[in-house]
A protein has these predicted regions:
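N-terminal targeting/secretion presequences
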Residues: 1-193
Length: 193
């Protein structure tokens, strides 16, 4: 199809969505309190997608991959995100050409893990992916990433060299959430720093 859709402004207010696959335990739910997209373009013929900005405010998303009760801590079979807020500008996608400026991202997960900030740029061309400075913060941890990844290094027969600088300060509280169920004496003995 060679359709071109111009999306001047899309606003969602208080939209709920639920999906359960027949004969499967997969369940998805979402509640979008507010979401908006401005100056969007979907060009199906050129396979090009772009938007000036995309925002989500105070929304909730959940994924359950089975009927079992969630494990203590971070359980990838049961993800529940609340208080999701994000603001992304300069969005562009066409093949290997990608651009996004993440201005804001905040979310809380069922396990207690909180992302208090995620900001930075992600861009790529036909040669490589660039992450010039991505910052991830929780109330207890901070991670900074700078990376250059040639597309050729992701192929079946990799070529080229990835370059990445990762600086991280991980808080005890976040590590214990990620680890899940641990003996209390181990938790007490684990150093704070």
């Amino acid at each position: 199809l060679n359709w071109v859709l111009k999306l001047d402004k899309i606003s969602l207010d208080r939209v709920a969505f639920a999906l359960q696959m027949p004969s499967d335990s997969l369940r998805l739910t979402a509640f979008v309190n507010k979401a908006g997209l401005n100056n969007g373009l979907v060009d199906l013929g050129a396979e090009q997608y772009k938007a000036r900005n995309f925002d989500i405010t105070n929304s909730t998303f959940a994924y359950d991959g089975n009927y079992a009760a969630p494990e203590q801590g971070l359980d990838f079979s049961h993800i529940r995100l609340t208080n999701l807020n994000t603001s992304i500008d300069s969005i562009f996608y066409q093949g290997k050409e990608i651009n996004a400026h993440i201005k804001e991202f905040f979310v809380e997960e069922r396990s207690g893990l909180k992302v208090s900030a995620l900001a930075g740029n992600v861009r790529s061309d036909h040669e490589q992916i660039d992450v010039p400075d991505l910052l991830l913060q929780t109330p207890n941890s901070e991670v900074r990433l700078t990376a250059t990844i040639p597309w050729s290094s992701l192929e079946d027969h990799p070529q080229g060299s990835m370059k990445a600088l990762l600086n991280a300060s991980l808080g005890k509280e976040d590590l214990l959430i990620a680890a899940g169920s641990l003996p209390e004496d181990f938790k007490k003995a684990y150093p704070d720093k």
